[in-house]
Structures are given as C-alpha cells and as structure tokens.
Amino acid sequence: FGNIKDEERRKSELDMKALSLFKRIAVREKFGVEFLQRNGIDAVEVIDPTLLLESYRDLLPHKVEERNEILFLSLSDTAEMNAFAKGLSVKTGLPIRKHYGYLQPERKKNMEFLPIEEWLYAIASAKVVITDSFHATVFSMLFGKPFYVYISEPSKVFRISNLLDILGIKRRIVNDVDDAIAAPSINYETCLLY
C-alpha cells in the first residue's frame, strides 16, 4: 500500500477478489487495514520487518565514527527538499552529504549509490538525517539519530506518518527549517523501539 493514495486507483491495482480468497492478510499500515476492511476483507496491522531485528550494527563495515554532517537520503530529490536541507545546513553550520534511494535516469551521472552496509553506516555515522524514505527513517531511529522527514509528495506520508504517530514523534515530519529546529528531540529510551 505504501505510496498509493487514491482509493480507486488502489482498487484497480489490486485484485480484490483474489485478496478475499486469503484466510489471513497482514499489512504494515493502518490505512491499509482500513482500506481492506472497507472493501470487505479482514486484515491486521503488523510491524515492518526491518523492526524485527534487534541490532543492525553487525552489518556495519567498521566501527561507527560520527561525522559532523547532515546526511541527505532522498527518494524524490525535489527542489523543495534540497532548499530545506540547505536551510538546515545554514542554521546548524553542518555540511550536507547526499545519497539517493533509487536510480533516477535523468540524474544518474551525479548520484552515488551505496551498498546496503555502507548505506547503514552512512545513517549510523551521521549527526543528523534528512529523508523522505520510510526505511531511512526506521534506521535513523534504530541507530538513535536525530532525523527529519521531509515530505515533498503527500502520497509518501502514510506509512511514515503511521509509524511516527505510534511512537509519539510525528513532529519529526517537517517542511520548514524553523519547525525542524523547534521540534523536540527524540528520547530514544522511552521510544517504543527500545
């Protein structure tokens, strides 16, 4: 269900009759459960599999040394998200290091893609993370990093918003530098993940 916002489009992309043949259906988002229930299909919400492993530190290629920088992990790389990152960089005095989540052919010449271990290390070693990615958000939390979720496309907010709402840290979703600076820090000791 991840990024599909429009209910009619979602219905057309899913075979509702085939789904109704399953005895049990588990999905990762509350809105997915609600969508299926509105269509007569029973479903339950389950935790994202990335949250099932207690620690990912064994996957890191070397000991974590914190880098004094903002890590920019983007799926969409919009002008607005870049402006937000630059504004946060100016306010904090931290430089930005960019990495991208998938190949965007029109920009591939300037993009750096990391193996998963290095991607995880980039998050674990960052001072702050800016992202629009669900999984970068999850790993920022798992590594206890301050992070900001910048949503350029509203269709991407559901899964991230659902998780942050459950954890009581929904104010990490921002689109304004001043809101980001004013957002309360995350107490990972009381956060549901720990």
Give names to the regions the model predicted:
Residues 1-194:
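Active-site anion-handling motifs in enzyme catalytic cores
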